[in-house]
């Protein structure tokens, strides 16, 4: 990931956008969602084409329109990639899509 793109990632996620990326031969998506009970969240999902995807990590959001910076911080700092966080692996990540930034 290039310098400055982390700011684009934050901006997109705070605006209910999503980020798709590849890391170590696997694809992932970070995106907002809503549970069956109406609770909003920001989650990291696997993004496989040939098998069922699963939620790697999910953090609840309490705003109706946007995602709190604190929630984005928690998601990006959670050590769910072989003991490392998204921010720790950022230099080895290939961003494939960012939706929601300017």
Describe each region flagged by the PLM.
Residues 16-19, 78, 96:
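Surface-exposed polar/charged interaction patches
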């Amino acid at each position: 990931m290039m310098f400055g793109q982390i700011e684009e990632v934050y901006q997109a996620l705070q605006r209910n956008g999503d980020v798709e990326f590849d890391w170590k031969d696997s694809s992932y998506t970070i995106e907002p969602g809503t549970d069956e009970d109406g609770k909003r969240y920001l989650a990291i999902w696997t993004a496989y084409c040939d098998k069922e995807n699963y939620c790697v990590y999910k953090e609840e959001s309490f705003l109706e329109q946007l995602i709190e910076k604190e929630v984005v911080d928690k998601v990006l700092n959670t050590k769910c990639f072989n003991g490392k966080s998204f921010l720790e692996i950022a230099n080895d990540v290939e961003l494939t899509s960012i939706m929601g930034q300017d």
